[in-house]
Amino acid sequence: LSVTAPGTWNHSMVIGMMVEAAADTIDANPVLARVGAYFHDLGKLKKPLYFVENQAGAENRHDKLSPSMSSLIIRSHVKDGIELARKHRIPQVIVDMIPQHHGNSTIEYFYEKARKEAEEADGHAEVDKSLYTYPGPKPQSREAALLMLADGIEAAVRTISEPSPDRIQGLVQKMINKVFASGELDECELTLKDLHSIAKCFTRVLTGIYHQRIAYAEPAEKIFEKAGGKAAGNAPKEETSSADDPGASASKSAKTVSEDRQKEAGAKGGKEDLKRLGL
Ligand SMILES: [Fe+2]
Ligand SMILES: [Fe+2]
């Protein structure tokens, strides 16, 4: 994944941290949750460039496709993931989490696009919703439910241009409410108390990762050189740690990372991405 679908890999690592921490707070299985996160989008390996997190500013391949074809490709990552996981003899308990992380949810972005196109063509917005709906089942375990929640929330938080703790918290709560109201959590045993703990935990983890750092007055490389360091690549750990910032290359300064993120968010179009996520 890290080579073929780096955006998906990064997304999987981040939600791995989120679900592990949350599982710990609600007495679910943290290791199962984390490993489930690592494999949940394995199927994206087949067509990585059709998934927004791997496009990195390149053209959006869906621009040339009908909404139903886009939906078919997006939905197929579940089936492809199950096949790949079985081929590589991943334990069944992890394979089960692959279809459950989307449950019976609808790919709202392409469903709405199809409705709009149908209305423009013949005045009727009638579209077969089943073409835009994942096959399920809904999450059957608390770990799979955590994965479903973290999946949507992490993707949504990436679209915030200036992710302050308040904004992250607001989005986490909004997403959890949305998934709860959709009925996707009806077949698992999460309680309302669990959902409250999960929201707090996800907010803490995501704030630690995505909250903007204060920009340095001058590039970190220069500060380091003044302090007697040599190459920028040897800059101090606080400024370059990829563990602190899984979305960035380890050789980037904190300021560059921060700027990159803002550019990235701008390029992708935060509003468009939120629409894609059904918000
Ligand atoms: Fe997925
Ligand atoms: Fe995902």
Where are these regions (language model features)?
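Divalent metal-dependent catalytic cores for phosphoryl transfer on phosphate-bearing substrates
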Residues: 2-165, 169-172, 178-182, 191-192
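Long, low-complexity, intrinsically disordered segments
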Residues: 238-279
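Long, hydrophobic alpha-helical segments that serve as membrane-spanning/inserting helices
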Residues: 180, 184-239, 247, 271
